[in-house]
Amino acid sequence: DFEYTQPSGYNSWCTANLPAPDIADGSDYFNTVLWTGTSAENPISTVGFQPDFTWIKGRDNSTNHVLADAVRGATKVIESDSDVVEYTDAQSVKSFDTNGFTLGTSNDVNNSTAGYNQYVAWNWLAGGSGSTNTDGTLSNTVTVSANPSAGFSIVTYTGDGVSNATVGHGLGVVPALVISKVLSGSTGPWYVKHKNLASGKNIYLNWTDAETSLTSGGGIGDLNSSTTFTCANGSSNNGNTNSSGRGYVTYCFAEVENYSKFGSYTGNDSSNGPFVYCGFRPAWVLVKRTDSTGSWALVDSSRSSYNVADDVLFPNTSGSESTSDTAIDLLSNGFKLRSAQRNFSGATYIFAAFAEHPLGGDGVSPATAR
């Protein structure tokens, strides 16, 4: 209540008077699910939508990360902790279903043995199995499954060997994060281009390296186009992003206000670490140091249901979940570092975050602290 009559055309300063968010419930487009393995065919039906990209990791066992998507097909697996190319595993993700997915009997996703049977899957909604995209200069067919409203697309293509070829991403805005993996032929790393990496530099999802300058081996070029990304520099190296005749998949993300955020912060080596504003209560936070070596670290609000969020998995290793590494408070409007890990004094870190709930807005209940 006001002591005096407020001037016309003004509202009180509160979350209810923020504009209505385009995405009122983050779980409509991104959701985390947990389960206990059964060693038998296992339908997971709690995602809330039919996922187009599912990333699975065993929590209490040292198994490879399993990444599958609707464009390549459910049984086609790649691993974030490895440079191996795509392989078929009919007993991992068997199908994408109306409200989730069905698992087979692979121990990587569905072991029933006590002490090795806890799993997590992170799920994103794109645009189904995809369609042909002709926005770029690549001469071969490009397939894109895009959800511009949620800032996410899956892109597959066969390389044509042309240096600096461009490939359509279907987002309609400049991406903030692009992650690329070779699917066929010889092994090759996961190239990552984040909007806060220096110009001409990439980082690797399956390694601990600092950001690295692009070489004749290629990579992903700077992010500056609302229609395409660039396969930079190389055409012949087995590890690049456009070697002739080899298949590739690329996951592209753009910022959506109140739903996704991509940025950077500087560490202070304190349990009273930096606060990072996102504009929402995060469901999922991924962090990586860029000025020196260091593992990727991933926390979410499902595995850590209260603060601090310290149930950590590492995309670049097959190791099990750790509770003695990174510690992060997931707040109503962002996150705060609560340990020296991912928070070295003066060090630079990039992050990606997806929302559990927007901070507030017209017709939306305000996000609360955990």
Residues of each region from the PLM?
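Surface-exposed molecular-recognition determinants
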Residues: 1-370
